[in-house]
């Protein structure tokens, strides 16, 4: 909910682009593992994130936000439910992205980067990753800012 509020507040400033991140769901780890972040949002923003991540060694993969998953998130008492109980264990990352999308203003290019897996490295050092917090997606954000400047 707090991330949704932050997205809505950021949209009050009418940004051209909105990129944000969190360790949103364990579903990201199930779908993409511990090295590849999941990215959800508008198609152009997702492709920008994917391209920037590739250039700086922080791979990200665009994920769909299917309408049928959104339909299962209807609520009798709220604008949207955080989960789709019809999916059982599947699609958790997609549900998270769909939930966040509800807070994005129309016309804003937006991408959420789910770094539940890549945020923390427990294996042997590789590339610029040592054990512990990786800093993903800071390099991606810096590349995005550079590309947009």
Kindly give the residue locations of the regions a language model identified:
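A generic structural signal for tightly packed, nonpolar segments enriched in small/aliphatic residues
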Residues: 1-149
């Amino acid at each position: 909910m707090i991330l949704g509020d932050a997205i809505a507040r950021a949209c009050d400033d009418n940004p051209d682009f909105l990129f944000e991140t969190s360790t949103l769901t364990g579903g990201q780890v199930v779908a993409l593992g511990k090295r590849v972040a999941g990215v959800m949002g508008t198609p152009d923003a997702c492709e920008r994130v994917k391209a920037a991540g590739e250039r700086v060694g922080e791979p990200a993969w665009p994920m769909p936000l299917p309408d049928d998953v959104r339909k299962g998130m209807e609520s009798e008492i709220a604008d949207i439910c955080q989960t789709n109980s019809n999916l059982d264990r599947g699609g958790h990352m997609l549900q998270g992205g769909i939930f966040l999308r509800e807070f994005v203003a129309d016309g804003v290019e937006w991408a959420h980067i789910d770094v539940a897996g890549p945020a923390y490295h427990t294996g042997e050092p590789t590339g610029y990753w040592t054990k512990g917090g990786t800093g993903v997606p800071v390099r991606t954000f810096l590349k995005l800012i550079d590309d947009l400047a």
